[in-house]
Amino acid sequence: MRTLWIVAVWLTGVEGDLSQFGDMINKKTGTFGLFSYIYYGCYCGWGGKGKPQDATDRCCFVHDCCYGSVNGCDPKLSTYSYSFQNGDIVCGDDDPCLRAVCECDRVAAICSGENMNTYDKKYMLYSLFDCKEESEKC
């Protein structure tokens, strides 16, 4: 019950595209994205360091790198326009920064869906303290 309460409190603080990103992951993986990926491996969730643990974690590593290349807005707080058309995620913003954030999320959601077979529950709630190897460069 305590875990459910913590997740509920955390979700009330989710704004902008992080909730949108969660929605994209939900559609592409069939999972509750924010819960399934929030502390997965070394890169899914807040921060990231070390070596990605599997292909799923690598999707998050690439997503972090993509966010790092966005200029002109805060990727974690920006709200963008997108839709689902015939199972595809379509980014719809004219603003270059918002479109870039949406594209980062779109690519990561597709990657997560394509790598569901590598998702390993042993990496759920993974501690960054276990991510000791040298971090890769983007």
Swiss-Prot record:
Compartment(s) where it occurs, according to its Swiss-Prot or TrEMBL record: Secreted
Keywords associated with the record: Calcium, Disulfide bond, Hemostasis impairing toxin, Hydrolase, Lipid degradation, Lipid metabolism, Metal-binding, Platelet aggregation inhibiting toxin, Secreted, Signal, Toxin
Cofactor binding description: Binds 1 Ca(2+) ion.
CDD domains in the record: PLA2c
Top-level taxon in the UniProt lineage: Eukaryota
Record-level GO BP terms: arachidonate secretion; lipid catabolic process; negative regulation of T cell proliferation; phospholipid metabolic process
Signal peptide: 1-16
A GO MF label: calcium-dependent phospholipase A2 activity
EC number per UniProt: 3.1.1.4
A GO cellular component entry from the record: extracellular region
Residues annotated as catalytic: H63, D105
Record bears the keyword Plastid: no
Main location: secreted
Required cofactor names: Ca(2+)
Catalytic reactions of this protein: a 1,2-diacyl-sn-glycero-3-phosphocholine + H2O = a 1-acyl-sn-glycero-3-phosphocholine + a fatty acid + H(+)
The protein's assembly and partners: Monomer.
Protein task: Snake venom phospholipase that inhibits ADP- and collagen-induced human platelet aggregation. This inhibition is completely inhibited by abolition of catalytic activity in case of collagen as inducer and partially inhibited in case of ADP as inducer. PLA2 catalyzes the calcium-dependent hydrolysis of the 2-acyl groups in 3-sn-phosphoglycerides.
Protein's recorded name: Acidic phospholipase A2 2
Organism: Macrovipera lebetinus (Levantine viper)
